């Protein structure tokens, strides 16, 4: 892990930590996510340079060390509910933000939710609704598909392929999007402090473009990313996007996307009930 | 009888002197059929189709109206080939007479008001290139945001605004020095930019936010941003009337053109058009607005006095942009 440069003031640098084992011990999903995070960090660094800012990515298996010595303001990872629980707890205790890239557990967004955790990965509840909505037999529910073209999806797919020699899959998209989202939040919140990031992410203003054609945002009641999903049958030419707007219905993107997942009134998350001692750095 | 025929014959012979008297022509880039439809604005009929062989997208007329420039892309977005170019169409003969290199995957561009230079966005390279139109040489390649798209030149030629869809930025190029002097943070997926005739304001559409953003060009600061179509319209094309009083925005997803009061940014009219209007252009007198409706394979013509569609012109496949030449 590179040593942090003491000369870099926090306000100009967003330090992001990717929590993953060494390359040899990574599952395919982890490897994909890592590629997405790397490209996301490269692109965020390019965008940041336009504003005289820096984005730094540090990787390691030891999340506590990333927060301590690595001085990261956000942790990315989570490839199983137990790991998301642990990383969410650590982030909450140490006052940083955790972005879940790969956990589907509904409880993580419900009874066990934490204010410091934000879920880019869709929940099991979202996946179930997407599957039933889609009307495609035998299709897997995905965040992304290499065959997507609209809204600049072709550009993103081409950039990823040019960078890594293979197509972008769901985990690749999640990693790429998580970094883009964090960098843009820091820029728009005019702060790379975790407390300011968190406040921005919970605000109505926080909207992101993920090349899916709709503004993406986090639900304030459970910090789940609202996003279209794609159901691809092995035999089909192109994936089916869900949810689709009802023809003629006058719905906002938020209303359409909230058809996937747990509505506010059914949420068991009590975000406001942070434990004593739970504070975010910068508050 | 005889003299009438002779007069007709003379009027058909193209010459620079007579070119001034001809009706304005609307040139439409058809991304799907890889050709350019030429519409006579008096009759609103297609009078010529110019094949270009590859995907044409951005299209602009030279200030003197004698040439039309069109951005061409091949099928390989991340590689530069002979297919990637800015083609020059001679308005009098309606033929492609020259090609300029403009980096890989040129999509949108602007011609400076003096007609001397062309600034293009290179979508996959994240750059904007300045080309000298007299020599065809690339004068400068400048780093802008990721996935650059819309390009606009200020009326005095001093500033070039380049949007970038992934970075959500507008890069401001000082055309005198060919340097990026600042970057403006936009809403989500900024697409097109247009300056007011007095140069004091620039308007930027943001496709995914569904907003129109107004920039003070003295400070390059965002003054405000207004939602169109409740944020769901996916706006792309934007033009300003010659008197500066009206701003027209093409909302692709809403299949409608929004007319705004330039001073208050209040909507004064909403004009339903064909499916997925993207590129729009006004005639020089501001009396007609031409909208390329990509999924209708038509150009819809709006009378700006009544804000009504007065003609629907079938063109090629997937019309993308439109430019008016004298």
How would you describe each model-predicted region?
Chain A
Residues 1-283:
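Extracytosolic ligand-binding ectodomains
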